[in-house]
Amino acid sequence: MTDPSDAGYPETNYPRSTRQLTPLELARRIAHLAESKLASDVVILDMRPAVSYTDFFVICTAANPRQARAITDEVREKLKHEDRVLPRHVSGEREATWIVSDYLDVVLHVFTPEARAYYRLEELWGDVPSIELEAVAG
């Protein structure tokens, strides 16, 4: 789990969370936060059988680069303030056709439709299981 103090942020700026999220809970939380900013085709891939550097990929589509940035920002801000979780690294925000946010246990991939069709991560990792998204309560 990413600790805010590891990223150079003073720990005192964050409210105390009652418990840490498991990697699967974090993946589902990220997926639902992306959906809240109208991301489409949200998929969670269980990467544990295939790679050692992360547990899950969350892959989603934004209508355009502006929405890709908005999704990335929403996830980052909500996790930062509500769960005390920060990404270790974010790349691709300038062009915003494929933004990758590395939360260590979970990697968020936000694509524009063209970039998602071009890179086809689901096909590349077609042998790993996908995780069902639970309905958002409320």
Give the predicted meaning of each segment.
Residues 1-44, 48-49, 63-70, 91-93, ...:
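Long, contiguous binding/interaction regions
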Residues 52:
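P-loop NTPase catalytic core of nucleic-acid-dependent motor ATPases
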Residues 71-76:
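Short amphipathic alpha-helices in soluble, non-transmembrane regions
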